[in-house]
């Protein structure tokens, strides 16, 4: 293997995101697809991962056992469900493997487990691996510092009918970016639902609205509304490949890291802007 390459393992190889990750890994210079995983009992076990993803034969066979492929990868990429990701996290921590985590929907205990593991292994944990979304998060911080104290802030997100968590991890990251810029804790100012007689809008809150329909890949808007004007900052994704490429870019970035918890803004160097 070339010294500059990083070998990656992909969790949930047969899922929508898993297949995109496999395609991206096969196409990206400096990355080698080392392993592809599916759950025990899946009909996809034994398949060629590249053929499964529509990218041609890869020579990597889809397996269910991390133990069986532990010597075949350096970084584990996981966009599955919280319970599965935490199982994979424990394995990677035990065996000194880096992780790129795009799974959303973790509770506080799950997030704490990731923080603790990052003391021993290097982890990029982000709600969204799109370059555009992470640029948007930086713009939201700037906008919040200028307009946040004088405007009503609402976050609207839309995803496909199969998404199981709400609000999306990206929407929550947007809220956290805005709240942090205003020296607030999102838990103290977020409003996640409105129904019936709600009374007037409470000043200083950040509202969330969620849409689930069709095959929407992902759309997010933050609205700063004042009397007579409003500013809207929007990101729309048309392909999951943007997330896959960002995840692979993160895996390459991790090759020089021994431990620590990072996000996509670290990978892109946005915090210096």
From Swiss-Prot:
Please tell me where NADP(+) binds in this chain. Answer: 39
Q: Which Pfam families does this chain map to? A: DapB_C, DapB_N
Task: List membrane-spanning regions.
Answer: none
Q: Which GO terms describe its molecular function?
A: 4-hydroxy-tetrahydrodipicolinate reductase; NAD binding; NADP binding; oxidoreductase activity, acting on CH or CH2 groups, NAD or NADP as acceptor
Query: Which pathway does the protein contribute to?
Result: Amino-acid biosynthesis; L-lysine biosynthesis via DAP pathway; (S)-tetrahydrodipicolinate from L-aspartate: step 4/4
**Swiss-Prot/TrEMBL GO biological process terms:** diaminopimelate biosynthetic process; lysine biosynthetic process via diaminopimelate
Tell where it localizes. Answer: Cytoplasm
Under CDD domains, the record lists: DHDPR_N
> SUPFAM superfamilies, alphabetically?
Glyceraldehyde-3-phosphate dehydrogenase-like, C-terminal domain, NAD(P)-binding Rossmann-fold domains
Q: What is its EC number?
A: 1.17.1.8
Active site located where?
159, 163
Keyword Mitochondrion listed: no
Annotated Gene Ontology cellular components are: cytosol
Q: What class of enzyme is it?
A: oxidoreductase
Which reaction equation describes what this protein catalyses?
Answer: (S)-2,3,4,5-tetrahydrodipicolinate + NAD(+) + H2O = (2S,4S)-4-hydroxy-2,3,4,5-tetrahydrodipicolinate + NADH + H(+); (S)-2,3,4,5-tetrahydrodipicolinate + NADP(+) + H2O = (2S,4S)-4-hydroxy-2,3,4,5-tetrahydrodipicolinate + NADPH + H(+)
| Keywords linked to the UniProt accession | Amino-acid biosynthesis, Cytoplasm, Diaminopimelate biosynthesis, Lysine biosynthesis, NAD, NADP, Oxidoreductase
The main location is cytoplasm
- Has the keyword NADP been applied to this entry? yes
Residues the record lists as binding NAD(+)? 12-17, 38, 102-104, 126-129
- The residues that the entry says bind (S)-2,3,4,5-tetrahydrodipicolinate are 160, 169-170
Per the entry, what this protein does is: Catalyzes the conversion of 4-hydroxy-tetrahydrodipicolinate (HTPA) to tetrahydrodipicolinate.
NCBIfam families (alphabetical): dapB
Q: Subunit comment for this entry?
A: Homotetramer.
Which family does the UniProt entry place this protein in? Belongs to the DapB family.
Q: Return the protein name.
A: 4-hydroxy-tetrahydrodipicolinate reductase
Name its species: Salmonella enteritidis PT4 (strain P125109)
